[in-house]
Amino acid sequence: MEYTPSPKPQLSSRANAFSIAALMSSGTPKDKETQESTIKPLEQFVEKSSCSQPLGDISIVDSHGEFTNSPSSLCTEPLIPTTPVIPSEEMAKISCSLETKELWDKFHDLGTEMIITKSGRRMFPTIRVSFSGVDADAKYIVLMDIVPVDNKRYRYAYHRSSWLVAGKADPPLPARLYVHPDSPFTGEQLLKQMVSFEKVKLTNNELDQHGHIILNSMHKYQPRVHIIKKKDHTASLLNLKSEEFRTFIFQETVFTAVTAYQNQLITKLKIDSNPFAKGFRDSSRLTDIERESVESLIQKHSYARSPIRTYGDEDVLGEDGQTMQSRGSAFTTSENLSLSSWVSSTSGFSGFQHPQSLTALGTSTASLATPIPHPIQGTLPPYSRLGMPITPSALASSMQGSGPTFPSFHMPRYHHYFQQGPYAAIQGLRHSSAVMTPFV
């Protein structure tokens, strides 16, 4: 019996359209990426730009603060009025140069990144500029603002070690001008000194009330420096349309705002270049909470940076400006005499005795010849007011006089931890079995 194959079932037009043969035959090569989806370096930043009006041939400033004419595709709402487009003859004579340009060039070659936090973070490198061509008898106001480079959001590709476009930019944040706190400057001052914006802080907190510059993370920004000639009748900067000003842009100061460094080379360069970042060489192993805690401790407690600390009961000023007594601790007697003040009164350094410790010194009548073992084994010896260790003989005398008794638990010396750097400090505090006592 001869076998005859059954005819293939006929597919509907809809099913046939999704068949393998149809899909393979109808496939078309993908269009190449357009120039708008690629990252372009910042060519020029416009002095006059607006999102609501088309851009034409407008006057802009190059990296040396000189005006040139070139079109730009940037779309940014200007913070400073753009009239007059061409500066006056007097303002045209002013030139501005970027200090530490070599350092900025190193960061620019790698792709500068700036950390932004809720509380605000200072910039490094710092924008420092110097002016020439100003009138020595006139007064000038120096400002800075930071504007977006484009309308794109970026992401860092670790496998390519480069920044890629991740999509459209987030909605623009409130634009702010930072007026240099030393303004207004006289022309003579500007000729003799440079202007440093070291106190500028960057934040991602949209509700910031401290005057910090608000930025979006993973967006590229361009700082701009403005100089305004202050007129005699000008009382404030509320109306800048009638003022004479000039804007300076430096291409090497373009940066990407981030909440954590993406490029490890940027991290290394900042640590090597920033003298205040030496202690954070191993900070990458710290958690965010630990890093913020260490930074706040270093800022608030000055003795963490110095081996010498005054341990008196001096009055301190509270937040409301009223005088308040410093808080006590586990090492405070019933007469409100702290352990450190009592020890310093019996240490033999009469020139540094606390006034309240004179009564304790007068009641100490024991002999100084018989030393006793240290009362707290395995811990640091007591320190006097200047951080000097107390001798066993002086300690023996103080133990038999009128003063507090030593507790039986460990006494952590936080300032010794912090001398080793923030990472060593947090490791010492993390692995220590000591009873944590408050700072006094």
UniProtKB/Swiss-Prot annotation:
One CC-aspect GO term: nucleus
DNA-binding span(s): 103-282
Matches recorded under InterPro entries: p53-like_TF_DNA-bd_sf, T-box_DNA-bd, T-box_sf, TF_T-box, TF_T-box_CS
Lineage of origin: Eukaryota, Metazoa, Chordata, Craniata, Vertebrata
Subcellular location field: Nucleus
One GO biological process term: heart development
Pfam families for this protein: T-box
CDD domains, sorted: T-box_TBX20-like
Keywords annotated in UniProt: Developmental protein, DNA-binding, Nucleus, Transcription, Transcription regulation
Protein name as it appears in the record: T-box transcription factor TBX20
Superkingdom to which the source organism belongs: Eukaryota
